[in-house]
Amino acid sequence: MNYMPGTASLIEDIDKKHLVLLRDGRTLIGFLRSIDQFANLVLHQTVERIHVGKKYGDIPRGIFVVRGENVVLLGEIDLEKESDTPLQQVSIEEILEEQRVEQQTKLEAEKLKVQALKDRGLSIPRADTLDEY
């Protein structure tokens, strides 16, 4: 096989359906329409998929331009196996509410963890304070 270096190898994947995982945790699914040398992507008929437990919801986003430095994972979706998922599709409102509840639960657990460490004389620096030099 003849492999092309870097992002040039993605030229073969243009016009195929892809899943893109972004640095901020979002998951996008759409058709790859364009790519450049910096791995900037243009996705068409894009949906943002939100997973909570065994449920998922799709939010239509249309044409989506993704800066290459924000891409964590890019993978082609097998159209034949796409419908064989064990996940249940729910409405946008329902998945957003479940996501909010899940995030609130995680926040409460983190607060309890920080308080338990504080009671023992330990502390974890907050993530936003680590950015300052």
Curated annotation (Swiss-Prot):
Query: Subunit structure, briefly?
Result: Interacts with SLBP; interaction with SLBP occurs when histone mRNA is being rapidly degraded during the S phase. LSm subunits form a heteromer with a donut shape.
Give the encoding gene's name: LSM1
Q: Which organism is it from?
A: Homo sapiens
State the family it belongs to: Belongs to the snRNP Sm proteins family.
Identify the taxonomic lineage of the organism of origin. Eukaryota, Metazoa, Chordata, Craniata, Vertebrata
Q: Name one GO biological process term.
A: neuron differentiation
Record key words, sorted: Cytoplasm, mRNA processing, mRNA splicing, Phosphoprotein, Ribonucleoprotein, RNA-binding
Which GO terms of the cellular component aspect does the record hold?
cytoplasm; cytosol; Lsm1-7-Pat1 complex; nucleus; P-body; ribonucleoprotein complex
Under the heading SMART domains, the entry gives: Sm
Q: Phosphoserine-modified residues are where?
A: 123
Q: Which residues form the Sm domain?
A: 5-80
Function (record text): Plays a role in the degradation of histone mRNAs, the only eukaryotic mRNAs that are not polyadenylated. Probably also part of an LSm subunits-containing complex involved in the general process of mRNA degradation.
Q: Sites of the modification Phosphothreonine?
A: 129
User: Where in the cell is the protein located?
Assistant: Cytoplasm; Cytoplasm, P-body
Q: Which GO terms describe its molecular function?
A: mRNA binding; RNA binding
Cross-referenced InterPro entries, in alphabetical order?
Answer: Lsm1, LSM_dom_sf, PTHR15588, Sm, Sm_dom_euk/arc
- Output this protein's name: U6 snRNA-associated Sm-like protein LSm1
